[in-house]
Design a protein with these regions (language model features):
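Active-site neighborhoods of metal-dependent hydrolases
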Residues: 1-15, 25-250, 254-255
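Hydrophobic alpha-helix feature that most strongly marks membrane-spanning transmembrane helices
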Residues: 15, 46, 195, 223, ...
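Structured core elements
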Residues: 23, 53, 87, 227-228, ...
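Beta-strand segments within the central parallel beta-sheet cores of soluble alpha/beta enzyme folds
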Residues: 26, 55-56, 191-192, 261-265, ...
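Divalent metal-coordination and catalytic microenvironments
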Residues: 89, 183, 230, 262, ...
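Short loop/turn motifs at secondary-structure junctions and domain boundaries
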Residues: 168-169, 271, 319-322
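Acidic, glycine-enriched loop/beta-strand segments at the rims
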Residues: 201-209, 215, 258-261, 271-305
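C-terminal cap of metal-dependent C-N hydrolases
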Residues: 217-224, 243, 291-342, 346-348
Length: 355
């Protein structure tokens, strides 16, 4: 845990560079320390010319129900009243994660530390030994029922999808149905599924219910930054890229947002936030970074695996991806990179810096 002096050193350094941004992720899922964490950041940056992007105001229904949302909304409004250069981050899609026993923080983040022992085991033989061990299974059942967070996915196995078998031994099915078929506790059934389908198999967790009203409010808020998605950094943990278009399919097509509001929040608003004054809107003198699409043609496509990520053995491992939405044309610096025939192969992009 960084102390105040360490944070101050960072903020003082950043304040010397015009256009620089400090990004802060606060905890409104596990330890629920979001409010005191942001109050601390606000105190330490008081009087400094520092732009802070903080993530952010929760947009999940359970976070609203648990009283986590309103105090952060009040902080957001206070920062605006004080004239702080604070930008509130949010996501327009609910959190969807994938659990793995090879590499995953999900079990520990859910207070499911008995299952995390399997993740921490260094070899596949050690993992199999734990999954087969009757004493470990008893502890895992108890932890599943009593220690896992009430808001964790493990409390609702009917929504956990066994949809990524390493060896394709079993069809896609929910953990709840799989446990019922085997006549086992969900924890035992999950252990059996990994043993039968391969230790590199993964489980997709159900999305939490989204607070649409808050998403709409923040999309329209000039001091909020949307379109947050870290799927590019977690190719095997989160769903593949493409969730940005759900702002169109879920909110524009349903009439909850105007198309102009959605597009501005993903283009000009973000360009302005990061200091890219030469792009983000269609105007004379701006870079021609343009996407052309017909809204009725756009869909949020199903995810699937492609094996094109280099691994440490000289081969390739997999990642999630999706088929094109599609859009009709993508221009970068005025040059098509995607058109009716697919990817063009052109790479006209350049390194950019804030202006």
């Amino acid at each position: 845990m960084a102390d105040d002096n360490e944070f101050l050193a960072i903020f003082e350094c950043v304040s010397r560079f015009s256009g620089a941004t400090v990004q802060v992720v606060i905890d409104s899922i596990m330890r629920m320390t979001a409010v005191p964490a942001m109050e601390r950041i606000a105190r330490l940056t008081d009087g400094m010319p520092v732009r802070v992007q903080w993530a952010g105001i929760p947009t999940l229904e359970w976070q609203k129900t648990y009283g986590l949302q309103q105090p952060l909304v009040e902080l957001h409004e206070r920062f605006i009243e004080e004239g702080r250069d604070f930008w509130t981050g949010y996501a327009h899609v609910p959190v969807v994660v994938t659990a793995s026993i090879q590499q995953s923080l999900l079990f520990a983040q859910s207070n499911e530390y008995v299952w995390h022992e399997v993740v921490s085991a260094e070899t596949d033989d050690e993992k199999r030994s734990l999954l087969n061990d009757s004493d470990w299974r008893a502890r895992a059942r108890s932890s599943w029922e009593n220690d896992s967070l009430e808001t964790s996915f493990f409390r609702e196995p009917s929504g956990m999808m066994l949809d990524n078998s390493e060896n394709d031994s079993d069809p896609i099915v929910s953990l709840g149905d799989y446990a019922m078929k085997l006549g086992l506790h969900p924890s035992d059934a999950l252990a059996e599924w990994f043993l039968h389908n391969g230790l590199s198999s993964t489980v997709s967790m159900p999305p939490w219910d989204q607070d649409d009203d808050m998403v709409i409010r923040l999309t329209r808020d000039p001091n909020a930054v949307g379109n947050i998605n870290d799927s590019g950094a977690h190719g095997q943990m989160f769903c593949g890229s493409g969730d940005s278009i759900r702002l169109w399919t879920d909110y524009v097509c349903s009439g909850k947002l105007k198309i102009e509001e959605a597009i501005h929040s993903q283009t000009g608003k973000l360009a302005n936030h990061f200091g890219f004054s030469d792009r983000g809107e269609i105007a004379v003198g701006k870079r021609a970074d343009i996407t052309v699409f017909a809204l009725e043609e756009v869909e949020h496509r199903a995810k699937y695996k492609v094996y094109d990520v280099p691994n440490d053995d000289g081969g390739f491992t997999w990642r999630w991806t999706r088929d094109p939405a599609p859009v009709r044309l993508t221009l970068c610096n005025g040059i098509p990179t995607f058109d009716k025939d697919g990817v063009t192969g052109a790479m006209p992009g350049e390194m950019i810096s804030p202006s």
